[in-house]
A protein has these predicted regions:
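The feature marks proteins involved in alpha-glucan
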Residues: 1-48, 52, 80-165, 170-177, ...
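Conserved, mostly hydrophobic/aromatic
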Residues: 55, 103, 166, 193, ...
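Short proline/glycine-enriched turn/loop motifs at strand-loop junctions of beta-rich domains
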Residues: 56-63, 585-588
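C-terminal beta-strand-rich structural cap/linker in extracellular carbohydrate-active enzymes
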Residues: 97-101, 610-648
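Substrate-binding/active-site clefts of carbohydrate-active enzymes
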Residues: 124, 139, 145-161, 167-348
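Conserved alpha/beta catalytic core and glycan-binding cleft of carbohydrate-active enzymes
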Residues: 126, 315-317, 335-500, 505, ...
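Catalytic cores of secreted or luminal carbohydrate-active enzymes
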Residues: 510-531
Length: 648
């Protein structure tokens, strides 16, 4: 009995020391597991089970816990102020899991603010705004150890990466139009993505948000997986199943700002707390949202802990950080007089820059095989450089310049494309300045921008040929890849977050064949290392011909580390080009190994069936050339053939 009592005393002493350290590190901006301290947690005190609640509200006069267990009466369960820095605490005996609760925060002006828990693990959704008590203990049995071991040995920079971006609420819906459960989505989405040859899924929305129309980007519950699609353990099932199929999960994450919903982080204790107090930094007026105070220690603990939380609890493989440019610049979408320069007289938000460096260093130290991806739309230097080299420390960045240039090009009538040929060639100039991902994301198929197939000029057949042409060109271009859902089968209308994709289109031959093309092209990409092994190195790409603008043709080589090569020819004209001469680096014969114009893809079936043999003669800087036929609106890939007929 004495031994048991001693063990209990030792445990309590260790518990108090851990809590004391957690408090200290939180206020220092260095507690990156704050979710284990703040929020609601199942525990046992004096042999009584219940939940302990902790919340940070330094400007509050008082705080209490209200919920369905006390009739939402803010006078029944007052919290105790544990620290001068404003952490409040209360143990509620006998409280069961999945109890609804909020914090009733009494502000200095006498208002009673009913706030959802910033650290809640599970929340109500949409019009309902309370938090649930929830414990992760014994909720799910992970079986993804093989994936984790595989990922440990993976060099992401020299591996294929082809991301399928998915909005969970509109990929598919139930027959009655309601949202599907995470498990139901997983059982359909994961095999589908695997069949189509994607390596990763990027999912939105994940964190809890009240408004469907925000697409999940205006978050009130940063630690709550949205309950639109089920419980936390249901989402764990989705991630686990993806890993069992060899597919990584990336989440869209929004540390830049938050909405002004009354139950959320907005002026949490009656005054600006999570947001800047300085009105020149406080708000994104065009979005109607508040900006996190990146220089405040407690906010750094909150946000960095949040990134760690998703990876620790849900085995997320990567984070795509949204709206990075809005964080980096003090004058982002601001007029003169609406912002103040930093201490050096510049427009950089030094606190946000420092925050991003700490974020990436922390995450990639704990999870070195994971991805930290920046959606950054400017030319800010060193986004994917390490912090010790004065970079931000992301390992990849969306190539928004490439995206804008090439989409502008393909939307042009082919007759006029010769005048914007530089849109295709200029991105190669900076292709290795950062570690890039080429994104055709949700932002490019809404708000009048049209779907991918409907961006293409011409008649019906030309639109589909244009998509095939563009996609294989994209797969062969340096950089990892991202494609938004629906593009793979030719969704004609723009994406609508309130409706599922037009899956009925697969009943039509052209759409089914386009889906077949996507699958075969993606699998071809996976199987050929010259298309990805040296994405981040200038050694992986070499122009053959970039100047044939009058005929809308490009030719280039892709190489791997062993020197194996593919020759890519892109014809962005609706005109067939017969006897087209192209310089090649070596003698021998060349074999056409992929052609977007095949009949099984919906094309005309024009092929180079005979193996073109290199002839002696100067062409494009080489001593030999081959003659090939280029179908209209097509991309072709050739490979050198050894003398014995074996491919290199």
């Amino acid at each position: 009995m004495a031994l048991v009592l001693l063990e209990e005393l030792d445990y309590m002493q260790q518990y108090k020391e851990d809590m004391s350290l957690a408090k200290y590190l939180f206020h220092q901006g260095r507690n990156f597991e704050t979710y284990d301290y703040l929020g609601s947690h199942f525990c046992i005190e004096d042999d009584q089970e219940g939940f302990v609640f902790r919340v940070w509200a330094p400007n509050a006069v008082s705080v209490s816990v209200v919920g369905d267990f006390n009739g939402w009466n803010h006078q029944l369960h007052p919290m105790k102020k544990e620290t001068e820095e404003g952490i409040w605490e209360l143990f509620v005996e006998g409280l069961e899991e999945f109890s609804l609760y909020k914090y009733a925060v009494v502000a200095k002006d006498g208002r009673v603010l009913f706030k959802a828990d910033p650290y809640a693990f599970h929340s109500e959704t949409k019009e309902k705004t309370a938090s649930y008590t929830y414990s992760f203990k014994d909720k799910f049995n992970w079986t993804d150890s093989d994936w984790q071991k595989y990922k440990e040995n993976l060099n992401a920079y020299e591996s294929p990466m082809n991301i399928y971006e998915v909005h969970l609420g509109s990929w598919k819906k139930a027959d009655d139009g309601q949202f599907l459960n995470y498990r139901v989505i997983a059982d359909e989405l994961i095999p589908y993505a695997k069949k189509l040859g994607y390596t990763h899924l990027e999912l939105l929305p994940l964190a809890e948000h009240p408004f469907d129309g925000s697409w999940g980007y205006q978050i009130c519950g940063f630690y709550s997986i949205t309950s639109r699609f089920g419980k936390p353990e249901d989402f764990m099932y989705l991630v686990n199943l993806a890993h069992e199929h060899g597919i990584g999960i990336i989440m869209a994450w929004v540390p830049a700002h938050f909405p002004k919903d009354a139950h959320g982080l907005y002026e949490f204790d009656g005054q600006p707390l999570y947001e800047y107090q300085d009105i020149t930094k406080q708000e994104h007026k065009q979005w109607g949202t508040r900006i996190f105070d990146f220089g405040r220690n407690e906010i750094r603990s909150f946000l960095i802990s949040n990134a760690m939380f998703w990876m620790e609890k849900y085995h997320i493989d990567g984070i795509r950080v949204d709206a990075v440019a809005s964080m980096l610049y003090l004058d982002y979408n601001r007029n003169d007089g609406e912002w103040r320069p930093n201490i050096y007289g510049g427009n950089g938000n030094l606190e946000a820059i420092e925050f991003l460096k700490i974020l990436n260093s922390t995450v990639l130290t704990k999870f070195p095989s994971n991805l930290m991806i920046a959606e950054e739309s400017t030319s800010f230097p060193g986004v994917t450089m390490p912090p010790d080299c004065d970079g931000l420390g992301f390992n990849f960045k969306w190539n928004m310049g490439w995206m804008n240039d090439v989409l502008s090009y393909i939307e042009e009538n082919p007759i006029n494309r010769q005048y914007c040929h530089g849109n295709l060639t200029f991105p190669i100039v900076y292709a290795c300045d950062e570690n890039f991902i080429l994104p055709i994301s949700h932002d490019e198929v809404v708000h009048g921008k049209r779907s991918l197939v409907n961006k293409m000029p011409g008649e019906y057949e030309n639109k589909f040929a244009g998509v095939r042409n563009f996609i294989l060109y994209m797969l062969c271009h340096p950089g990892k890849k991202l494609m938004y859902m629906g593009s793979e089968f030719g969704q004609f209308i723009e994406w609508d977050y309130s409706k599922e994709l037009d899956w009925f289109l697969l009943k039509f031959d052209a759409h089914k064949k386009l889906q077949t093309f996507f699958s075969e092209a993606n699998h071809f990409y996976l199987a050929h290392s010259p298309l990805w092994e040296l994405d981040c190195s200038a050694e992986g790409f070499e122009w053959i011909c970039h100047s044939d603008h009058t005929r809308n043709i490009l030719a280039f080589r892709r190489l791997n580390r062993a020197g194996d090569e593919l020759i890519v020819l892109v014809n962005f004209s609706p005109v067939i080009r017969e006897d087209y001469y192209i310089g090649v680096p070596s003698e021998g014969t060349y074999k056409e190994i992929f052609n977007t114009d095949l009949k099984k893809f919906g094309g005309s079936g024009i092929r180079n069936r005979k193996l073109p043999k290199a002839k002696t003669g100067q062409m494009h800087g080489y001593d030999q050339y081959i003659s090939v036929t280029l179908p209209p609106l097509s991309t072709l890939i050739f490979q050198p053939v050894k003398q014995n007929g074996m491919k290199i």
